[in-house]
């Protein structure tokens, strides 16, 4: 697509949303509590702020404001307001305090922001634990959130990823013609490295006429030792390893396809 000469600012909003899952098996209630505490500390508000700050650097956005919060008993949230235009570093506020009033921020928040929320959880009896991170990178202008794909998936050690990319609104060229998208895309996969794509099974569900693109990813290789918390495969019987492998694989399939799978 040739470069457009626009009339005024690029008014297209480009949003990339992730659900990233980490799956684990913890045998006892204490182990499950231990996993939740571990993952909660591993992805606390400070660590997530570091990840999102680097994301801003990757996509070429300028940070205006950071709001972050750890929650009791678990979970964290970080929201960063960004702009396309350079800002004076002396005007950037990253301290922890209440942000601007809604009247001062709502117009900007509708355009460009990066946010993440985390959701650790566990099965009450089955030993299965999951950690989900919801991430949204929404930009207005020429900045593309797709540049952050590989970095975010890698940083959050993802077993399963579901992604949505959508372009909303329109912008006008100098002749007054409306443009509802300003770049070529037929799949989110085209913006991933070959190394990343080789690690995952992938499936697309795209609605091209609406500029909506959806991709699901699940790790190809399954190694039980990477999914056990406070345990090693050699400490388990063959029957136990088979049972846990079945539980984990079923859990991953259900999350990947978004539906419960009945036992046969």
Swiss-Prot record:
Keywords: Autocatalytic cleavage, Decarboxylase, Lyase, Polyamine biosynthesis, Pyruvate, S-adenosyl-L-methionine, Schiff base, Spermidine biosynthesis, Zymogen. GO terms for cellular component: cytosol. Pathway: Amine and polyamine biosynthesis; S-adenosylmethioninamine biosynthesis; S-adenosylmethioninamine from S-adenosyl-L-methionine: step 1/1. The keyword S-adenosyl-L-methionine applies. The modification Pyruvic acid (Ser) is found at residue 112. The record marks 111-112 as: Cleavage (non-hydrolytic). Its EC number is 4.1.1.50. Binds 1 pyruvoyl group covalently per subunit. The keyword Translocase does not apply. Is synthesized initially as an inactive proenzyme. Formation of the active enzyme involves a self-maturation process in which the active site pyruvoyl group is generated from an internal serine residue via an autocatalytic post-translational modification. Two non-identical subunits are generated from the proenzyme in this reaction, and the pyruvate is formed at the N-terminus of the alpha chain, which is derived from the carboxyl end of the proenzyme. The active site is at 112 (schiff-base intermediate with substrate), 117 (proton acceptor), 140 (proton donor). One of its GO terms (molecular function) is adenosylmethionine decarboxylase activity. One of its GO terms (biological process) is spermidine biosynthetic process. It catalyses: S-adenosyl-L-methionine + H(+) = S-adenosyl 3-(methylsulfanyl)propylamine + CO2. NCBIfam families: SAM_DCase_Eco. Catalyzes the decarboxylation of S-adenosylmethionine to S-adenosylmethioninamine (dcAdoMet), the propylamine donor required for the synthesis of the polyamines spermine and spermidine from the diamine putrescine. Belongs to the prokaryotic AdoMetDC family. Type 2 subfamily. This is S-adenosylmethionine decarboxylase proenzyme. It comes from Yersinia enterocolitica serotype O:8 / biotype 1B (strain NCTC 13174 / 8081). The lineage of its organism: Bacteria, Pseudomonadati, Pseudomonadota, Gammaproteobacteria, Enterobacterales.
């Amino acid at each position: 697509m040739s470069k457009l000469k626009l009339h005024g600012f690029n008014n297209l909003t480009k949003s990339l949303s992730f659900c990233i899952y980490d799956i684990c098996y913890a045998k006892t209630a204490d182990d499950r509590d231990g996993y939740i505490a571990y993952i909660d500390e591993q992805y606390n508000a400070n660590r997530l702020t570091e990840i999102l700050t680097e994301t801003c650097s990757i996509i070429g956005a300028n940070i205006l404001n950071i709001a972050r919060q750890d929650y009791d008993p678990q979970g964290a949230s970080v929201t960063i307001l960004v702009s396309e235009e350079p800002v004076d570093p002396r005007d950037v506020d990253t301290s922890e305090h209440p942000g601007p009033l809604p009247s001062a921020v709502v117009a900007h928040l509708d355009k460009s922001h990066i946010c993440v929320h985390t959701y650790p959880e566990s099965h009450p009896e089955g030993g299965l634990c999951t950690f989900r991170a919801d991430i949204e990178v929404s930009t207005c202008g020429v900045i593309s959130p797709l540049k952050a794909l590989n970095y975010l998936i890698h940083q959050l050690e993802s077993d399963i990823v579901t992604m949505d990319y959508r372009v909303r609104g329109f912008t006008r060229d100098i002749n007054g013609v409306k443009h509802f998208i300003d770049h070529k895309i037929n799949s989110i996969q085209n913006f991933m490295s070959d190394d990343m794509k080789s690690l995952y099974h992938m499936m697309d569900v795209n609605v091209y006429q609406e500029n909506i693109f959806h991709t699901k990813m699940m790790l190809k290789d399954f190694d039980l030792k990477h999914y056990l918390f406070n345990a090693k495969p050699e400490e388990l019987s063959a029957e136990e390893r088979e049972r846990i492998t079945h539980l984990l694989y079923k859990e991953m399939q259900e999350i990947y396809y978004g539906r419960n799978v009945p036992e046969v």
